[in-house]
């Protein structure tokens, strides 16, 4: 009765109006699952391949019909007849069917859509929530959210190199309260921006994208918003995080961090050592708890220096650096580079490999942050993954745009369903830092 009888993919649109995949999996029992695939703007060069058509006459070359066809004509034939509950076997079968190290033949977007849909169909068959199916009876930790309230870099037209300025309600007693704190700061920030005559339009991930005078202007404005909303900045209240997305402004030929790419003439151009110094200055000055991709994805020496300098005080998250891949994570652990991994399901392409990366991180004492992409959909699977794995942290955008709010609302539902069992760790989510 739990046997897969049909698999069907279609092309749909993501939050940026670009094509992506939606996959449906059907079983003999009538149990059904649907998965939608996100897409990134700033992508690591080692990520699994997102298959696009390249036909400029259709969706500016970004169509996904090839990936759709791969699901409907190749993957479907291979997995029809499998028990939908056998997630690992199905994921491994698709990896083998693709046969490339980066899923470049069938497309990670094709494979991931199926992987998510299979898991949802299995949960439907067993009549349990997705987070319970994926995580079992020990599922209980609601993630501390990283809320991206200011967008810069490749996510907006704001003249700031850092891609994301985030707030984290680490002092909140529950996820529900943490979400309220974040929403109130978001609205306080909007009011402050209006009073300064700055634009309150939002970027890809729902954060504001004003023309600040620089990084510190952005941080100072966030601190004012935290105060205006009635909260304190720090471990008992709300802390700040960056996604530097440094690979987006790293000049490989000159081996420098060229801030002029986003901030214009006169902006800083920093060596690897100077980049570390700059980040340390910011940490010394402001209540910063997490920095993502502070160094370029291939600047391993820079990462090691950054970790040596700040790794006991600040969460140093590898996104482009690790691309949710156990091979790169294992090297980072061995060489003491970073102390946390960002988990993006489409960087690696299957739920099985995603869970393996989270498990490896935890075993090494690294934290794991489950994350969205800048091109999102209404699919809320990552909310369930964050709870299923007790990851403790989630990064899923600002307090606007339904594609972001869908994940927060799902977490509110899960917190209600878990009842007294639910735990919100807040500052304790950063278990590998000396506080």
Swiss-Prot record:
List of residues binding (2R)-2-phosphoglycerate: 163, 344, 373-374, 395
Annotated PROSITE patterns: ENOLASE
Name by which UniProt lists this protein: Enolase
GO BP terms, alphabetized: glycolytic process
Cofactor: binding comment: Binds a second Mg(2+) ion via substrate during catalysis.
GO molecular function terms noted in the UniProt entry: magnesium ion binding; phosphopyruvate hydratase activity
InterPro entries given in the database record: Enolase, Enolase-like_C_sf, Enolase-like_N, Enolase_C, Enolase_CS, Enolase_N
PANTHER family listed in its UniProt record: ENOLASE (PTHR11902:SF1)
Residues at the catalytic site: 205 (proton donor), 344 (proton acceptor)
Binding site for Mg(2+): 243, 292, 319
SUPFAM superfamilies recorded: Enolase C-terminal domain-like, Enolase N-terminal domain-like
Keyword Plastid: no
UniProt-annotated location(s): Cytoplasm; Secreted; Cell surface
Function noted in UniProt: Catalyzes the reversible conversion of 2-phosphoglycerate (2-PG) into phosphoenolpyruvate (PEP). It is essential for the degradation of carbohydrates via glycolysis.
EC number(s) on file: 4.2.1.11
Family indicated by similarity: Belongs to the enolase family.
Needed cofactors: Mg(2+)
Catalysed reactions, as listed in the record: (2R)-2-phosphoglycerate = phosphoenolpyruvate + H2O
């Amino acid at each position: 009765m739990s046997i897969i009888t049909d698999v069907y993919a279609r092309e749909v649109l993501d939050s940026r109006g670009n094509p992506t995949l939606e996959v449906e999996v059907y079983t003999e029992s009538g149990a059904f699952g649907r998965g939608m695939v996100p897409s990134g703007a700033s992508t690591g060069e080692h990520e699994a391949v997102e298959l696009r058509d390249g036909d400029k006459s259709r969706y500016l070359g970004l169509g996904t019909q090839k990936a759709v066809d791969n699901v409907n004509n190749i993957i479907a034939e291979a997995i029809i007849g499998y028990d939908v509950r056998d997630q690992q076997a199905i994921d491994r079968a698709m990896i083998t069917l693709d046969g490339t190290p980066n899923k470049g033949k069938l497309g990670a977007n094709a494979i991931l859509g199926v992987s998510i849909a299979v898991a949802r169909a299995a949960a439907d068959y067993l009549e349990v929530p997705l987070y319970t199916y994926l995580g079992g009876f020990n599922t209980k930790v609601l993630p501390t959210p990283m809320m991206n309230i200011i967008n810069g870099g490749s996510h907006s037209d704001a003249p700031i190199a850092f891609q994301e300025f985030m707030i984290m309600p680490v002092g909140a007693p529950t996820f529900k309260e943490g979400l309220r704190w974040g929403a109130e700061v978001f609205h306080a920030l909007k009011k402050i921006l209006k009073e300064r005559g700055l634009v309150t339009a939002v970027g890809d991930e729902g954060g504001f994208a004003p023309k600040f005078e620089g990084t510190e202007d952005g941080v100072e404005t966030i601190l004012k918003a935290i105060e205006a909303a009635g909260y304190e900045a720090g471990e008992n209240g709300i802390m700040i995080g960056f996604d530097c997305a440094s690979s987006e402004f790293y000049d490989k030929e000159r081996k420098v961090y060229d801030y002029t790419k986003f901030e214009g003439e006169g902006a800083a151009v920093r060596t690897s050592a100077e980049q570390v110094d700059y980040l340390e200055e910011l940490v010394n000055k402001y209540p910063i708890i997490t920095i993502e991709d502070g160094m370029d994805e291939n600047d391993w020496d820079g990462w090691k220096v950054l970790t040596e300098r700040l790794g006991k005080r600040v969460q140093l998250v590898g996104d482009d650096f690790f691309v949710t891949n156990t091979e790169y994570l294992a090297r980072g652990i061995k060489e003491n580079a970073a102390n946390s991994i960002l988990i993006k399901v489409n960087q690696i392409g299957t739920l099985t490999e995603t869970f393996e990366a989270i498990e490896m991180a935890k075993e090494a004492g690294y934290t794991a942050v489950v994350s969205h992409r800048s091109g999102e959909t209404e699919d809320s699977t990552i909310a369930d993954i964050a709870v299923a794995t007790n990851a403790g942290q989630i990064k899923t955008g600002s307090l606007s745009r339904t594609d972001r709010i869908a994940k927060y609302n799902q977490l509110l539902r899960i917190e209600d369903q878990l009842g007294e069992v639910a735990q919100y760790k807040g500052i304790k989510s950063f278990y590998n830092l000396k506080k």
